[in-house]
């Protein structure tokens, strides 16, 4: 996850304009956006982290740090203003400290135990400045100086403020104010001669002198290619130059003295593992000192390790199952020289000075070798002093068969004494992978001393506190002065005590003052003169002199309207059209608008279902083609994304108005349950009260299908039956209070007695009720008078327009869907609800098919089979009814 930190120059000199008409700061903002677009082409850019630092005073210089998201980064970038000084040194130190904030907590640097190239946090700092003189509060500086004192704990462990995986690049804007007459030549971008260039080269980066917009785009494309995971190493030659490969004679044409390839400051690429996305390694680069167990602290290290290479040709050594690390070198004069030798079968050993206990140069820990195809040079990192270790391990497994002898152990122990103790951990893992887990004893100490461990742990805790403090301070604005402090010019007596001043007063008033004025400035400590608040608009109607002359007529009109419309609770200081005059830059700021919107009120009665909007096609509920306000999408947009097809969209629909008829609170009637076939039937099973069910509707519901009042809620049986005496009043009260609106209908009619069926299966009662809800009773008035009390007949007419077929069916569908989703195989309630479906036969069949489709979604095979049998029975009985009616 590379970190891309942009350090933007926000000094006042960035307000200068180029020949394009834009300021340097606007050019810098556009360059950042262009870089992000170019970087987004790479799939690896998904893990990029962007940070933004300016030239302001810390901690206000950090605009976007570790916790800020991409939107915050872009918003802070757009709001940058060019004001202040060119404090490049302080800003660079702030940027490096921000990057190093968590390194001591995570242990990336691994102080005192070797440098792990595979444990890194690559970062690139891109500075965009105008290359002007460095200015501070103390004056103008010619050279770049970074502050030595850093508030970050643990900064004393590294000599430089940066680390080996952090590089600095600078875009120095040299755009002229006038158009150049000469045509631009397509050449390389030169280095800039400003003070930041040496700092870039020290970190492994470079500077770009940008003279035209075309050159700026070229630099940005080059910077995108520089985003690589790797660490910077100083390669230095040790010993004599290599002899020519051809005949072993020295090359006379080769110039003497220092060559560019003798000392290179370049990057080695640390490629991430394609499977895990994280680099994998085994061996560290040794420290430049021998660890001392008695030392209470660690000596400071350099940011970039100095790796010396010997030009003596050696054979590359590798044995089976022994891991090694391979890193590709960035193209440099050193890689070019090695590739020109065209000897991929030989290698040059690499060392770190003072890494051994008794040797100044140390022992080799790897080698440089050209690839077989001669297209790159690789650094192979091996175990420390590998020319001694590899033959020992080869003999152990090939000769001794993993059973070491006494002589071999003595040789191995003597090797361990020449190896830094922090190599014991990686070596133990390596020999375990090779098949010798007990070769190195666990009792051997290879860690740091207790005092050093305590010291590092203390630094880690302090770094964590500092990290939390810095992260918490990001985004805070500079505290503005609320007023101008009043300071006394002198600490002497006031002007009132001067003799000439007193005489002057006496000459004017011809009277001696009774008391001298005590105008001592000490009485005004903390006194401030208030500043004018630019955001506060003056109330111009209070003072006529505050009104500009050109706005007098407008104010008179506004004051007249406020006077005539005195019923308002407040006066309007501006016209209605001015309230909606918003700058274009703020029109899309929906988040700030939503913060000011009051929270919506809660539902008056959340248990009542909302009325379904059925205008037009009732089955098409999602209006995807509607034009809605984008501000509302932030609130209600994502809520309907995962709606299932066929499920009613209940969100965003106005709530159904409750019917205020007295019948809702009237006397409850015990429903009469009769058998389909004849005779006294068993009572309908009472259902338990369920808190999630919709509240019961009144027993006497009246629908408005025709001009005549058709009472669908009281369904009469035309077979002469009596009320079953087995149903107790308590049971019926329980059923009435807990059942659904449709479950209150317990008296289906039967027109099928003439068919002569003695047994119609389990769901015969439901089939009869399902068929006959759309049949009209023989005598509407008789049906109503038989079942509804006289006191309720007049009141029942008021309910005629309260409920419709669609509303009843919608509530039934919601309850049936809940029953389908419940676990188990108790489907009696589903068939009980199905018999109360309203509407024509075609509407009921469509309703039943939707129920079957929903049951198939939840793999309810038994329910599907019963519903299909139920559907076949309906078709069969409907055909018989049609046959009887035709006869």
Curated annotation (Swiss-Prot):
A motif (Inhibitory loop) lies at residues 626-633. Widely expressed. Expressed in heart, brain, placenta, lung, liver, skeletal muscle, kidney and pancreas. GO terms for molecular function: protein-macromolecule adaptor activity; transmembrane signaling receptor activity. It comes from Homo sapiens (Human). Residues 3-227 form the VWFA domain. Induction: Frequently down-regulated in nonsmall cell lung carcinomas and prostate cancers. Down-regulation in prostate cancer is due to CpG hypermethylation of its promoter. However, some involvement in cancer is unclear. GO terms for biological process: protein localization to chromatin; regulation of transcription elongation by RNA polymerase II; RNA polymerase II transcription initiation surveillance; snRNA 3'-end processing; snRNA processing. The modification Phosphoserine is found at residue 804. It comes from the Eukaryota. Component of the integrator complex, a multiprotein complex that terminates RNA polymerase II (Pol II) transcription in the promoter-proximal region of genes. Keywords: Chromosome, Nucleus, Phosphoprotein. The keyword Transmembrane helix does not apply. PANTHER family: DEAD/H BOX POLYPEPTIDE 26/DICE1-RELATED, INTEGRATOR COMPLEX SUBUNIT 6. This is Integrator complex subunit 6. The inhibitory loop acts as a regulator of protein phosphatase 2A (PP2A) activity: Asp-629 and Glu-630 residues mimic phosphoserine and phosphothreonine residues and bind to the PP2A catalytic subunit PPP2CA active site to block substrate-binding. It is found in: Nucleus; Chromosome. PROSITE patterns: VWFA. The keyword Translocase does not apply. Component of the Integrator complex, composed of core subunits INTS1, INTS2, INTS3, INTS4, INTS5, INTS6, INTS7, INTS8, INTS9/RC74, INTS10, INTS11/CPSF3L, INTS12, INTS13, INTS14 and INTS15. The core complex associates with protein phosphatase 2A subunits PPP2CA and PPP2R1A, to form the Integrator-PP2A (INTAC) complex. GO terms for cellular component: actin cytoskeleton; chromatin; INTAC complex; integrator complex; nucleoplasm; nucleus. Belongs to the Integrator subunit 6 family.
């Amino acid at each position: 996850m590379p970190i891309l930190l942009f350090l933007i120059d926000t000094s006042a000199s960035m307000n200068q304009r180029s020949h394009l008409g834009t300021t340097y700061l606007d050019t810098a903002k556009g360059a950042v956006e262009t870089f992000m677009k170019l970087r987004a082409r790479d799939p690896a850019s998904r893990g990029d982290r962007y940070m933004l630092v300016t030239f302001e005073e810390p901690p206000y210089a950090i605009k976007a740090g570790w916790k800020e998201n991409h939107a915050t980064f872009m918003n802070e970038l757009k709001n940058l203003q060019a004001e202040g000084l060119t404090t490049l040194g302080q800003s660079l130190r702030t940027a490096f400290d921000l990057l190093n904030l968590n390194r001591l907590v995570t242990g990336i640097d691994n102080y005192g135990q070797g440098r792990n190239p595979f444990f890194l946090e690559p970062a690139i700092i891109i500075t965009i400045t105008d290359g002007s003189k460095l200015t501070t509060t103390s004056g103008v500086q010619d050279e770049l100086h970074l502050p030595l004192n850093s508030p970050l704990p643990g900064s004393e462990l590294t000599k430089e403020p940066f680390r080996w995986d952090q590089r600095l690049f600078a875009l120095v804007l040299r755009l002229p104010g006038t158009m150049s007459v000469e045509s631009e030549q397509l050449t390389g971008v030169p280095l800039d001669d400003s003070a930041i260039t040496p700092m870039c080269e020290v970190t492994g980066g470079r500077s770009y002198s940008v003279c035209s917009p075309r050159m700026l785009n070229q630099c940005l494309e080059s910077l995108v290619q520089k985003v690589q995971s790797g660490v910077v190493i100083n390669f230095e030659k040790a010993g004599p130059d290599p002899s020519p490969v051809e005949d072993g004679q020295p090359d006379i044409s080769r110039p003497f003295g220092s060559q560019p390839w003798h000392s290179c400051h370049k990057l080695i690429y640390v490629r991430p593992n394609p499977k895990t996305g994280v680099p994998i390694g085994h061996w560290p680069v040794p420290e430049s000192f021998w660890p001392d167990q008695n030392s209470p602290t660690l000596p400071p290290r350099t940011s970039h390790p100095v790796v010396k290479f010997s030009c003596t040709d050696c054979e590359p050594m590798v044995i089976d199952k022994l891991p090694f690390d391979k890193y590709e070198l960035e193209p440099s004069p050193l890689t070019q020289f090695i590739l020109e030798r065209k000897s991929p079968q030989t290698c040059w050993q690499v060392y770190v000075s003072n890494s051994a206990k008794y040797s100044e140069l140390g022992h080799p820990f790897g080698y440089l070798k050209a690839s077989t195809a001669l297209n790159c040079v690789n650094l192979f990192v091996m175990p420390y002093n590998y020319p001694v270790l590899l033959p020992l391990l080869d003999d152990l497994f090939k000769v001794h068969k993993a059973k070491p002898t006494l002589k071999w152990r003595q040789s191995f122990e003597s090797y361990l004494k020449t190896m830094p103790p922090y190599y014991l951990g990686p070596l133990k893992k390596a020999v375990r992978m090779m098949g010798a887990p007990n070769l190195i004893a666990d009792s051997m100490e290879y860690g740091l001393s207790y005092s050093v461990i305590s010291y590092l742990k203390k630094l880690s805790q302090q770094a964590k506190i500092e990290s939390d403090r810095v992260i918490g301070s990001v985004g805070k604005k500079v505290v503005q002065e609320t007023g101008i402090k009043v300071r006394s010019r002198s600490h002497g007596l006031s002007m009132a005590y001067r003799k000439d001043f007193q005489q002057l007063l006496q000459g004017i008033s011809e009277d001696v003052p009774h008391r001298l004025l005590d105008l001592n400035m000490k009485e005004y400590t903390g006194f401030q003169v208030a500043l004018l608040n630019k955001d506060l608009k003056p109330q111009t109607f209070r003072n006529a002199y505050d009104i500009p002359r050109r706005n007098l007529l407008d104010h008179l009109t506004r004051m007249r309207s406020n006077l005539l419309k005195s019923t308002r609770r407040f006066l309007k200081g501006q016209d209605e059209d001015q309230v909606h005059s918003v700058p274009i830059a703020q029109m899309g700021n929906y988040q700030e608008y939503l913060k000011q919107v009051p929270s919506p009120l809660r539902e008056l009665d959340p248990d009542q279902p909302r009325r379904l909007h059925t205008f037009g096609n009732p089955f098409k509920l999602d209006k995807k083609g509607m034009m809605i306000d984008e501000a509302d999408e932030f609130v209600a947009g994502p809520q309907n994304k995962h709606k299932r097809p066929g499920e009613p969209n209940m969100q965003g629909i106005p709530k159904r108005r409750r019917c205020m008829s007295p019948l809702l609170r009237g006397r409850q009637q015990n429903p009469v349950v009769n058998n389909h076939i004849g005779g006294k039937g068993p009572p309908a099973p009472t259902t338990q009260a369920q808190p999630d069910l919709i509240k019961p509707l009144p027993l006497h519901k009246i629908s408005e299908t025709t001009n005549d009042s058709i009472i669908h809620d009281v369904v009469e049986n035309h077979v002469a039956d009596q009320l079953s005496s087995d149903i107790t009043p308590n049971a019926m009260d329980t059923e009435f209070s807990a059942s659904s609106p449709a479950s209150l209908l317990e008296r289906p009619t039967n027109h099928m007695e003439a068919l002569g069926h003695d047994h119609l299966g389990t769901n015969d009662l439901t089939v009869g009720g399902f068929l006959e809800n759309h049949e009209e009773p023989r005598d509407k008035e008789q049906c109503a008078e038989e079942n509804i009390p006289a006191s309720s007949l007049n009141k029942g007419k008021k309910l005629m327009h309260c409920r419709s077929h669609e509303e009843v069916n919608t509530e039934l569908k919601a309850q049936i869907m809940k029953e389908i989703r419940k676990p188990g195989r108790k489907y009696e309630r589903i068939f009980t609800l199905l018999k109360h479906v309203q509407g024509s036969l075609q509407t009921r069949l469509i309703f039943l098919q939707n129920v079957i489709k929903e049951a198939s979604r939840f793999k309810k095979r038994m329910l599907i089979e019963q519903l299909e049998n139920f559907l076949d029975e309906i078709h069969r009985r409907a055909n018989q009814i049609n046959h009887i009616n035709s006869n």
